[in-house]
Design a protein with these regions (language model features):
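Catalytic cores of phosphodiester-bond hydrolases, prominently lipid phosphodiesterases
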Residues: 1-182
Length: 182
């Protein structure tokens, strides 16, 4: 958190100079409740920089912490008076009336739904399914991301064209060049 805090202070309240918020996904691999409690203690010190919820009201910050992996129960999260974390959901969470101030993102394993690897044309049937999933998530005003999606220009183009909000990549330089060329 300290490097983000330094950047936040250098940019007068933002991580990026263009005032775009940053999502920091924390993939919990340990005991959910215990980890969440420790995180809460740590994150409180960075409150001016963070998005948080107080009495069901969202205070948007420069950094939004999203818990993924072994997450605490939604009911445990809901009942916290001042909360510095949000939940990463799954497609199975769509349609359950989970508020965006609890679960702003739906994440999915690409390989659970698609066979296309980013080479050649994406099969029409898979493109239709992809569009339907994105629309379903967007109807709840949530953002969508896939992990293990095709990590190349063709894959990025498809994801951008259908409206995927957050694109995972291990090729940061190539993706950055791709984004600024388009």
């Amino acid at each position: 958190m300290d490097p983000l805090w330094k950047q936040y202070n250098e940019n007068k309240g933002y991580i990026y100079q263009n005032n775009i918020s940053l999502y920091l996904l924390v993939d919990i691999k340990t005991a959910a409740k215990k980890t969440h409690n420790v995180l809460g203690e740590i994150l409180h010190h960075y409150k001016p920089m963070l998005s948080y919820v107080v009495s069901d009201s969202l205070i948007q910050g420069a950094v939004t912490i999203i818990l993924s992996g072994n997450k605490p129960d939604i009911e445990d999260i809901k009942n916290i008076e001042e909360r510095f974390v949000f939940m990463d959901g799954r497609l199975s969470d769509v349609g359950k009336n989970i508020s965006n101030i609890i679960m702003p993102i739906i994440s999915m394993d690409w390989l659970d739904h698609f066979t296309w690897s980013g080479l050649g044309h994406m099969p029409d049937k898979e493109l239709i399914i992809l569009n339907e999933i994105v629309q379903k998530v967007h109807l709840e005003n949530k953002q969508i991301r896939f992990w293990a999606s095709p990590d190349n220009k063709r894959g990025w183009n498809i994801l951008e064209n259908v409206g995927v909000d957050l694109i995972n990549t291990d090729k940061l330089n190539q993706f950055s060049t791709h984004k600024f060329q388009n």
